[in-house]
Curated annotation (Swiss-Prot):
Gene3D superfamilies per UniProt: 3.10.450.50, Helical scaffold and wing domains of SecA, P-loop containing nucleotide triphosphate hydrolases, SecA, preprotein cross-linking domain
Function according to Swiss-Prot or TrEMBL: Part of the Sec protein translocase complex. Interacts with the SecYEG preprotein conducting channel. Has a central role in coupling the hydrolysis of ATP to the transfer of proteins into and across the cell membrane, serving both as a receptor for the preprotein-SecB complex and as an ATP-driven molecular motor driving the stepwise translocation of polypeptide chains across the membrane.
Main location: membrane
GO molecular function, one term: protein-exporting ATPase activity
E.C. numbers: 7.4.2.8
Group of enzyme by EC: translocase
Gene from which this protein is expressed: secA
Protein name per its UniProtKB record: Protein translocase subunit SecA
Coiled coil: none
Residue ranges of the region described as Disordered: 872-892
Keywords attached to this entry: ATP-binding, Cell inner membrane, Cell membrane, Cytoplasm, Membrane, Metal-binding, Nucleotide-binding, Protein transport, Translocase, Translocation, Transport, Zinc
Length: 904
């Protein structure tokens, strides 16, 4: 009997069907304009862009311009690339412009789709960011689609790591900018560590289109981007504690593989206490439970996790004396990414490579909070529907399935479940051999480098030629993927998410043409292309007859979405194909999430060795397990976001205030307000309201103003006068400190004083924010234990982090007032002595034979900072944070960025 839901869908259609239906009239209007736009000259296409820009900037809505803009963009793409967008691609572009996630299957041309909403929104003049998962794709897409934008009269830039500053600023200043999610996030953090607006890279966050949006906004959501600096070196401690792990037995610890956590049992704690005390690392009578043991407990716990939960060639690789993490979702190496809390150092100790010092966080942001900065956000992926709830809850993004241009002809078969991994891999080899013999290309999906290389050895033993694509071979990635659809090809790959290159049946024509032209520069390119296209057509037909691409997965992933991405590599643009998952009860997902019931069923069925169970019930059971894991991960991310939102509000407040300070010339007013609050606080502390004069702590107040403002005030004389109360005292102190600052301003000059105030203010904000981040990290690590006392950890975190934030602001006011109180102009004698020392240092550096030139006179702002207590010219740690364009504090006369700043 048919359910009511099924009948309702047949009668009224699904919500997705209705969304698609609403775009059809717009697509029809765009198609109706096509003949007129085909007649335009190239110059007229650019003129159309200028007209649309003028209308957008005059206030006409982008929705009103959509039809003409899409028609213009389609014609430009046809001329620049020889590609005419399908109606389904126009639909995808419309959904993106409306701020949705467009789910488009592999091979449907997502790269071209993004040009339509990017062009339309760029007309507003605020810049559009197109976000990719790696630098290769950012460069490739900007170069490829840049031809379309230039044909339309717009500029296109690409952002990449270690790019020169001027080039990066120009890329962000372009109408459309391609960049990776990592680089965008790091540049946002770097911008908020700059000392002037002119040095910043990014404009306002207007509109971003995120490719592989599920990978970036869900898989990477829990990963914070952190800019950090080194802390003290503890490498000896990591090595020492690592040596204890091999002595542990299973009774000494408990593992939680679901949450990647490890804890010591009572037996384990007793064993470690005895060993550590015997070796002198733990004093006699001191327990691991004592507060003094916190550091040892933390680091030996991380050593346990490193050995028991993180595995070489699965979670990381060892290369060039370094531990490089592997992205569990894409199989790519993540160079430069490090685990926090000493875990990375514990893995380095385990693998006997050089241990890098732990880092202190200077600035951080999560992708969840970075991408929520944009006025409008959209995304593209082949698999989003399973995560629609999360996209809606966290990012307020709807998910729309865009129809394929041609119906999907891939056959998705039921999973085959074997009892043991040995039986499973034997069946996998047989299936690969059968497909290879009939010429069907096979893509074999594995979950780790270790398993991909084990399977490779098994295929070698059978004499089957194949390619392996994992984190070790990522340089040959494009070539391996391009060949994966050729007749009889066998390709073993770790997770294929975000690979960015389509597997085309018969091979990639364009790549083959470019290779041949490069190898035979004297041959006619047209002849090479014609020959290769003919060869490709013949090979493609044979592959189609063999059944198209066979996707063979050797394990299910925790996420259904990753499995669907792998399936989606087959059956692109209506091609035939087949997908099949081979599983065993020893697989991680089955083992961790309960294969006991299935084991019982298999036993009752009396299965023999090598036999598999194939039934829709098995698929449903596994998908339920995956849905449970996805739900748990979603809950984690949601909870983490609630905590991060607390810090995010504070981050936005600090970064916003910092930006205002960089943009304003009225610094003295901000500084005066801070000084006044310090005065009010100190007077309230030492001369409380409604107290008598003889109750005031005059000497304490005098010492406090000397310490915090650098001024010795005649407070005792003022207090002895008739009629002096707290208000009178406040007025006199304020007038005295204002007068001192006025004298300094006159001595330095108003412009120089403004520079000094701005530098001190920005440096102090940065230093205090860094300290605050460390404090919040510590609070975050311990607040979870409040749950044992029946208190809500999130509520406690909100309350205490707000108190810490207020305390940081108080400390900021005191520090700025104190540093400004300490600066003074140099006397002529001091200045002459400083110049003499600089000249001597230069002479020593350049050699006695070369007479040293007298160094260039330093700006007063630098002289003032040099005069501050604690400043040592030869010690960069006492220089504070000079602006990159300031003269270097070492006295070389060079700009900081060309001297010591270049080494930083």
């Amino acid at each position: 009997m048919l359910g009511l839901g099924y009948i309702g869908r047949k009668l009224f259609g699904t919500p997705n069907d209705r969304k698609v239906k609403r775009t059809r009239p717009l697509v029809a209007k765009i198609n109706a304009l096509e003949p007129a736009f085909e007649k335009l000259s190239d110059a007229e296409i650019v003129a159309k862009t200028r007209e649309l820009q003028a209308r957008a900037q005059a206030g006409e809505s982008l929705d009103a311009l959509l039809v003409e803009a899409f028609a213009n963009c389609r014609e430009a793409a046809r001329r620049a690339l020889g590609l005419r967008a399908f109606d389904t691609q126009l639909m995808g572009g419309i959904f993106l412009h409306q701020g949705n996630i467009a789910e488009m299957k592999t091979g449907e041309g997502k790269t071209l789709v993004a040009t339509f909403p990017a062009y339309l929104n760029a007309l507003a003049g605020k810049g559009v960011h197109i976000v990719t998962v790696n630098d290769y794709l950012a460069r490739r897409d900007s170069e490829w689609m840049g031809k379309v934008y230039r044909h339309l009269g717009l500029t296109c830039g690409v952002v990449y790591p270690f790019q020169p500053d001027d080039e990066k600023r120009a890329a962000y200043g372009a109408d459309i900018t391609y960049a990776t999610n990592n680089e965008l996030g790091f540049d946002y953090l770097r911008d908020n560590m700059k000392s002037s607006v002119a040095e910043m890279y990014q404009r306002d966050h207007f509109f971003a289109i995120v490719d592989e949006v599920d990978s970036i906004l869900i898989d990477e959501a829990r990963t914070p981007l952190i800019i950090s600096g080194p802390s003290q070196d503890r490498s000896d401690m990591y090595r020492t504690l690592d040596a204890y792990i091999p002595f542990l037995t299973e009774e000494h610890y408990k593992l939680d593989e679901k949450q990647r956590n490890a804890t010591f049992t009572e037996e384990g704690n007793e064993f470690l206490e005895q060993k550590l005390q015997a070796d002198g690392l733990l004093p006699e009578g001191q327990s691991l439970y004592d507060p003094e043991s916190t550091t040892i407990v933390h680091h030996i716990g991380q050593a346990l996790r490193a050995h028991k939960l993180f595995f070489k060639d699965q979670n990381y690789v060892v290369t060039d004396d370094e531990i490089v993490l592997i992205d569990e979702f894409t199989g790519r190496m993540m160079k430069g990414r490090r685990l926090s809390d000493g875990l990375h150092q514990a893995i380095e100790a385990k693998e006997r490579v050089t241990i890098q010092p732990e880092n202190v966080t200077l600035a951080s942001v999560t992708f969840q909070n970075y991408f929520r900065l944009y006025e409008k956000l959209a995304g593209m992926t082949g698999t989003a529907v399973t995560e629609a709830e999360e996209f809606g809850d966290i990012y307020k993004l709807g998910v729309v399935e865009v129809p394929t241009n041609r119906p999907v002809a891939r056959k998705d078969e039921h999973d085959r479940v074997y009892r043991t991994a040995k039986e499973k891999y034997a069946a996998v080899i047989e299936a690969i051999k059968t497909a290879h013999e009939k010429g069907q290309p096979t893509l074999v999906g594995t979950t780790s480098i270790e398993k991909s290389e084990m399977l490779s050895e098994m295929l070698k033993a059978e004499g089957l030629p194949h390619n392996v694509l994992n984190a070790r071979q990522h340089e040959q990635e494009a070539q391996i993927v391009a060949d994966a659809g050729r007749l009889g090809a066998i390709t073993i790959a770790t997770n294929m998410a975000g690979r960015g290159t389509d597997i085309q049946l018969g091979g990639n024509v364009e790549m083959k043409v470019q290779e041949e032209i490069a190898a035979n520069p004297e041959a006619a390119p047209e002849e090479i292309r014609a020959r290769i296209e003919a060869e490709h057509a013949a090979e493609k037909q044979k592959v189609i007859e063999a059944g198209g691409l066979f996707v063979l997965a050797t394990e299910r992933h925790e996420s259904r979405r990753i499995d669907n991405q792998l399936r989606g590599r087959s059956g692109r643009q209506g091609d035939p194909g087949r997908s099949l998952f081979f599983l065993s009860l020893e697989d991680d997902l089955m083992r961790i999430f309960g294969s006991d019931r299935l084991e019982g069923v298999l036993s009752k069925l009396g299965m023999k060795e090598g036999e598999a169970i194939i039934h829709p019930w098995v698929n449903k059971s596994l998908e339920r397990a995956q849905a449970k894991v996805e739900g748990r991960n979603f809950d984690w991310r949601k909870q983490l976001l609630k905590f991060d939102d607390v810090m995010n509000d504070q981050r936005k407040a600090v970064f916003g205030q910092r930006r205002e300070i960089m943009e304003t010339d009225e610094i003295s007013e901000i500084v005066a307000d801070m000084r006044q609050q310090v005065i009010d606080d100190l007077i309230d502390d030492f001369a409380p309201p409604k107290s008598y004069v003889d109750q005031w702590d005059i000497e304490g107040m005098r010492a406090a103003f000397i310490d915090h403002a650098g001024v010795d005030l005649p407070l005792a004389d003022w207090a002895a006068e008739e009629g002096v109360d707290q208000d009178v005292l406040r007025e006199r102190v304020t007038a005295a400190l204002d007068a001192v600052m006025a004298q300094k301003t006159e001595a330095f000059g108003a412009e120089t004083m403004r520079v000094i105030e701005k530098q001190i203010l920005l440096q102090t904000i940065d230093a205090k924010w860094r300290e605050h981040l460390v404090t919040l990290e510590h609070l975050r690590s311990v607040v979870g234990f409040r749950g044992y006392a029946q208190r809500d950890p999130l509520s406690e975190y909100k309350t205490e982090s707000f108190q810490l934030f207020e305390s940081m602001l108080d400390s900021l006011r005191y520090e700025v007032t104190k540093r400004l109180g300490q600066i003074r102009p140099m006397s002529d004698e001091e200045r002459a002595e400083m110049l003499r020392q600089q000249a001597a240092a230069l002479a020593a550096a350049e050699g006695a034979a070369d007479p040293a030139e007298a160094p260039a006179p330093q700006p007063a702002a630098q002289v003032a900072l040099a005069a501050a207590p604690g400043f040592v010219e030869s010690d960069p740690t006492t220089w504070g944070e000079p602006s990159r364009n300031d003269p270097c504090p070492c006295g070389s006369g060079e700009k900081f960025k060309h001297c010591h700043g270049r080494l930083a």
